[in-house]
Amino acid sequence: MRSLSRFRLITFDVTNTLLQFRTTPGKQYGEIGALFGARCDNNELAKNFKANWYKMNRDYPNFGRDTNPQMEWQQWWRKLIAGTFAESGAAIPDEKLHNFSNHLIELYKTSICWQPCNGSVELLQQLRKELKPEKCKLGVIANFDPRLPTLLQNTKLDQYLDFAINSYEVQAEKPDPQIFQKAMEKSGLKNLKPEECLHIGDGPTTDYLAAKELGWHSALVHEKSYAYLVKKYGEDIDRDHVFPSLYDFHKKISDGAVVW
């Protein structure tokens, strides 16, 4: 952990870094859909969820916050849910859509849908044990809606964190520099410099490269090979700062095998 003692701020992405889905959205949506009489193939739901996710992010960025007129994030999810089921052959009647979508929205605040990624809890515990809170702050920077604090509380990760920033409330999505700057402000650390900050996430562009461009240090948690990542995202990715999981990151940090 000695190599991390140089940092005054360490931040994490959430999805596929600290937390991951227990089951695919297709399977989870299928189970809840069946309760409301909307039965369809889980594979179709998975395919159409993914398609609607990309479409909604393209047409209504940042869960609707960055559109004109602004869309409430709950409405954003209702629209995505309605599109996913309609394209899967089980359109939700308007009179049921509100209750149905609210059920899913509430469910995805909980540990029923989410679980810690490999090594995330152990790493956070070790960081909290070895890095003094007055000298190093731990936080989350996530492209997420305002459910984020409740989700972290329900999955018991909030006890290790000093703050959590979601893109909807700060009106800036990664890789926008503003969301990283908000994290520096939120830390409350005086005279904090970018080179004293470390961000860890699974997004080559939204996490790793975005943080580096601001002068932060960054680590990429990604299952793809280094050769694949360099071919797709360029030479700015450092081989020594790519890890298959937080478990692997924790092990290499503990062994003193990572140099910043």
UniProtKB/Swiss-Prot annotation:
One GO location term (cellular component): mitochondrion
Triggers of expression: Maximally expressed at predawn or early morning.
Gene this protein is translated from: Reg-2
Alphabetized NCBIfam families for the sequence: DREG-2, HAD-SF-IA-v1
Species for this entry: Drosophila melanogaster (Fruit fly)
The protein's name in its UniProt record: Rhythmically expressed gene 2 protein
SUPFAM superfamilies: HAD-like (SSF56784)
Matching Gene3D superfamilies: HAD superfamily/HAD-like (3.40.50.1000), Haloacid dehalogenase-like hydrolase (1.10.150.720)
Organism superkingdom: Eukaryota
InterPro entries: HAD-like_hydrolase_domain, HAD-like_sf, HAD-SF_hydro_IA, HAD-SF_hydro_IA_REG-2-like, HAD-SF_hydro_IA_REG-2-like_cap, HAD_sf
